[in-house]
């Protein structure tokens, strides 16, 4: 059974593409028809692509991978932030910091700077600064929080990107392509699908369509996380059982050596007593 239905997508307006004159010919396989000079997306293909993408994303989450959500367009910011946070995934909803992926060490330094400021506040160092220094640091902290706060826990490059609006987020897509990071994306009729690893043909402007598709991806992530959590106790039990098996094996080996030693001693005694018996005769 599909994770998402044709009717749900239709109701969300996911089928509305862009004007015919704005189309990208590479999206032709995903276009159903043209109506009133607007391309209509084939939602049957959208359903299949959503299922495909969701299964891959679920597997990534199950393996402890991080998926970075990127959506800086106005109508997508709030829902993407909420959905990504609900499954503990990093996200970017403000301006994409150039080099965020290709120059990741520098981005991590900026995040560490934010952490250092927090430590200064916690240990009282901040209180000893002048008013001017306090103001400068407070402004710097606010700026860092706005652009990097949502990725503060991302200690390494993400395993994948999920992008809403390929054209608007072209810098993020290009950086991911350069590093070989898989890209999942909602791709409208005016975009180039060749840059995307997992294409989900859809209207990328309609809020309902964005919430529906991204919500489905986050549900798949949550399933993967739950399966990962369920498997951990089994792994712990296996790890606990291993030492017990080793102890039993060592104990068995000791008993075996003890039996061998006893058998050897008995044989030696018999050999020693044999001549005495002959002499007695």
Curated annotation (Swiss-Prot):
Residue ranges with Low complexity bias: 262-272
Biased composition (Basic residues): 245-256
Alphabetized UniProt keyword annotations: Ribonucleoprotein, Ribosomal protein
Keyword Ribosomal protein found: yes
CDD domains: RPS2 (cd01425)
GO BP terms, alphabetized: translation
SUPFAM superfamilies attached to this UniProt entry: Ribosomal protein S2
Name of this chain's protein: Small ribosomal subunit protein uS2
UniProt source species: Porphyromonas gingivalis (strain ATCC BAA-308 / W83)
